[in-house]
């Protein structure tokens, strides 16, 4: 397929992706799919990783969409240690969330932490770092935290 026959925009998982990028790099435009997962999807489907996304046939694009759906249901052959949602809080299943579903789930997790007044939830409420970083010299924007300056 010549370069002028490349589809400029390809829609996968409700996201418009650049058809001029190589397949794995284009797939990273979908929220929840990083470069490692994109390569895993390509290898699982037997796609040429050097091909541009716009050069793929409609059938190959359909297969990519089906694989992404399988990931979110936990039915893919990709190992579960690569999933972004292992041992889900409600179901206990391993799944890989993408797009709006991922954003919604993360928001629900944070809201749950806030509701039960967990330390992490309180830090989220206050807009402070959650993962134990120091606040004396970092995260100074917006509010006074840490040590006051001597006068």
Curated annotation (Swiss-Prot):
Biased composition (Basic residues): 133-151
One annotated GO molecular function: rRNA binding
Keyword Ribonucleoprotein: yes
GO BP of this protein: translation
Record keywords: Ribonucleoprotein, Ribosomal protein, RNA-binding, rRNA-binding
InterPro entries tied to this protein: Rbsml_uS13_C, Ribosomal_uS13, Ribosomal_uS13-like_H2TH, Ribosomal_uS13_archaeal, Ribosomal_uS13_CS
Region (Disordered): 131-151
GO CC term (a single one): cytosol
Keyword rRNA-binding appears in the UniProt entry: yes
Family membership: Belongs to the universal ribosomal protein uS13 family.
Summary of the function given for this chain in its UniProt record: Located at the top of the head of the 30S subunit, it contacts several helices of the 16S rRNA. In the 70S ribosome it contacts the 23S rRNA (bridge B1a) and protein L5 of the 50S subunit (bridge B1b), connecting the 2 subunits; these bridges are implicated in subunit movement.
Subunit structure: Part of the 30S ribosomal subunit. Forms a loose heterodimer with protein S19. Forms two bridges to the 50S subunit in the 70S ribosome.
Protein name as catalogued: Small ribosomal subunit protein uS13
